[in-house]
A protein has these predicted regions:
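Glycine-rich portal/gate segments that line the openings of hydrophobic small-molecule binding cavities
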Residues: 72-141, 173, 197-200
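Short, highly charged C-terminal tails/helix-capping segments
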Residues: 23-24, 192-200
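Hydrophobic ligand-binding cavity/cleft-lining segments
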Residues: 19-84
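Beta-strand/loop substructures that line and gate deep hydrophobic ligand-binding cavities in soluble
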Residues: 134-189, 194-196
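Fungal secretory targeting signals
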Residues: 1-20
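A short, structured loop/turn motif at beta-sheet edges
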Residues: 44-48, 124-131, 150-160, 199
Length: 200
């Protein structure tokens, strides 16, 4: 009996370490696309704290070198909402930097106008119980994409942040050739910015 309890204790103690070192993911399975941009980073924080920062769109400029401005509007009537948190079905409008600005950033860090782009998205999944958030790009049929972000408690006071955006469509190959490397850099910079902000 003592031996089995000891082994159970050792297994539970080592499980978070194994998760952190493995290719564990909290991201859902996604269909392959023409290309994708991804990020994965361990952060000394809690899932609730990271979720609060990730879903506080009004405060993105305080830490995010990629998404410098985010605005949510209602699905009906396209009305700016007083609560700038994600709700499934609502719209998101972003002003982004591709490539991302150098870290660190804050709300007063100016954009590089040559790298500024705008995008419109629809929020598709808000899953706080799973630590997952997703939206679809509302572009032309020539380029479509879905972006997922996920948070996981991996033990020892650490959170795993993951993000993936999968691009499809006729012009997705052109996007990959022109901005693929910069998009990847931007995803990695956002992950680093989240880490810096949560660990300061």
């Amino acid at each position: 009996m003592f031996k089995s309890k000891f082994l159970s204790f050792v297994s539970l103690t080592l499980l978070p370490v194994a998760l952190a070192q493995s290719e564990y993911t909290n991201l859902p399975a996604t269909a392959p696309g023409v290309f994708n941009a991804t990020a994965r980073i361990e952060i000394k924080s809690t899932v609730p704290a990271a979720w609060d920062v990730l879903t506080d769109f009004a405060n993105y400029a305080a830490w995010n070198p990629f998404v410098r401005y985010a605005l949510t509007t209602s699905a009906k009537g396209n009305i700016t909402l007083p609560d700038q948190r994600p709700v499934e079905g609502n719209f998101l409008f972003f002003r982004v930097q591709i490539p991302a600005l150098p870290l660190p950033v804050n709300k007063d860090t100016p954009d590089n106008l040559l790298n500024t782009q705008l995008s419109a998205e629809r929020i598709t999944h808000v899953q706080p119980e799973l630590g997952r958030l997703a939206w679809d790009y509302l572009g032309e049929l020539a380029i479509t994409s879905t972006r997922w972000q996920a948070l996981s408690d991996i033990g020892n006071g650490m959170v795993l942040y993951e993000s993936i955006e999968v691009f499809h469509g006729l012009f997705a190959g052109v996007l990959k050739d022109t901005l693929g490397e910069s998009l990847q850099q931007s995803f990695e910079a956002q992950a680093e910015g989240l880490k810096l902000y949560l660990e300061c």
